[in-house]
Structure formats: C-alpha cells, structure tokens
C-alpha cells in the first residue's frame, strides 16, 4: 500500500457515504475531519506496528498529515434562553442536571459519574473523582488538572443539588471500578449516583446512572420544546465559562474550576468574552494605581 492509496482512502472517508444501521433509511454522506483523523490514526498505528516488527519496510503513513479542523466558536445560551430551557424540562431531575451543568461547567462524563460521596453541601464543594467515557467505562477525569479538582459551587448550583438530594440522596450505593491512567490499574470507589434514570423511568432495563450519549440526546428535545435556536449539548460548559468571564471572574479561577491545566485555554477559547470588561478594568486600574502617580506642577499638566 502506498501513500497515494491512503490519501484516496482518506478522501473516501471524508466525502463518501456512511454504512448505516439496518433501521436507518436515510443515507448520510461525509464525516467530520476529527472522525477521519481518528480512523487514520488507528490505521497508522497498525502500519507502524508492522514496520517496527519487520512486516513492512516503511510506514506509508509517514508522509500524511492530519486534516485541519475548523475551530467552533463558543455559542452559549443567553440568560433568557436558559430560563426557557429550564422551564421546558419535563422532570425535576432534568432541571437539576442542566442547572448544575451550566452553573459548574462540568463535563458531561463527569456529571454522569457524579456521586453524593463527592459532594459537601455545607462547604459548597464538589470533588471531581471520575469521568464516564463514551464506551461506558469509568476513568479518571480527562486531564491531570481535572482529577480530584475542587469545584466551588455558587448558590444556584447548591440549590439544584439540594433539590436533587430529595430524589437520589438515599439511593443505592454501588462499588464502581475506576480505571487509572497506568495500564491495568484501577480503584474501587463507592458511588451513590446523583443523577439516576430510575427517577424518570423505572424498569429492569433502566440503569442507575446516565450514559454520556443519553445526556446528549436529552438536550435536543428540551431545546426544541423551549423554542430556542439549536446548539449542541457541550454548550452547557461554554455557557458557564462565558457567563463567568463576562461577570468579571478571574480566568485562572475559571480554568481551575473547569479542569484546565492553566488559563491559556480560557484565554484562547473565550478571549472575546473577557474584552467586554476592558472599560471596567481600566477604571479599576485608575482607582488602584492613580495614588502612586507622582504629582506634577499645574503648568505642566495644562501644557499636556
């Protein structure tokens, strides 16, 4: 196989029709750049294994770069849209879940894995100990900075958790295996899940915690019922960041809350929401630093 062959495969993955399930009648054409990059990366690893172990002389992937991805701008809910969204939630648990998502910026996998054992309502904190992956495995949170991070809750988030406590605080406790970053290593953690599908629909096939995909599927119908413009469910996280920065919160604090290593990601993704506070920052600096300015003779001031 040559590099030219692989470039053709990549083009087909990017622009060709997808193989759909039997009950899916509408054909879908094309894939996202990120999806194609993932497929190509898996194939590249197979070829690299073959090269390293003498099955092939060279890896044809060596001359192929990753497809560039368009950077999506944050598209947060407005305060009015959020109110309508919460009002459109059909169950109290959904109102609590999405309120906590927006008022903490937690990743959806972290919300799925959130347990009452992680929460101290008296201190107003959450310790993020685990994340649920797309393949329904519990792992540590996405980044080292996000692991065991302390989220300091604002009052609306505390209120949502107090409401949710009436539904699930006395629920069943599970022993959950959480995979660590080192291969083959895991720990067992006791978990009384905060958000349980059993509250909404009881049955033998209903689980005791949500899957990440089901969280995303819950979002779309609520958006539709609320009559607001559609955006993906990840915007709940962007909404927290944009609202907080627009209110003048410290970017370093927001980065810590969201599990970023430092504030660089916050500046990169949400920079324009910070610029709205430029006038206030100048006023603050004037008040704080003017007293350090040396006094000038009146004639010099007039001349300037």
Predicted regions located by residue number:
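A short, basic/aromatic helix-end/turn motif that makes direct DNA contacts
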Residues: 113-119, 255-261, 271
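Short, charged phosphate-coordinating catalytic segments
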Residues: 48-59, 101-132, 252
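C-terminal secondary-structure termini that scaffold catalytic or DNA-interacting sites
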Residues: 123, 136-159, 163-171, 180-183, ...
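Short, basic (Lys/Arg/His-rich) helix/loop patches that form interaction surfaces
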Residues: 19-23, 87, 91-94, 104, ...
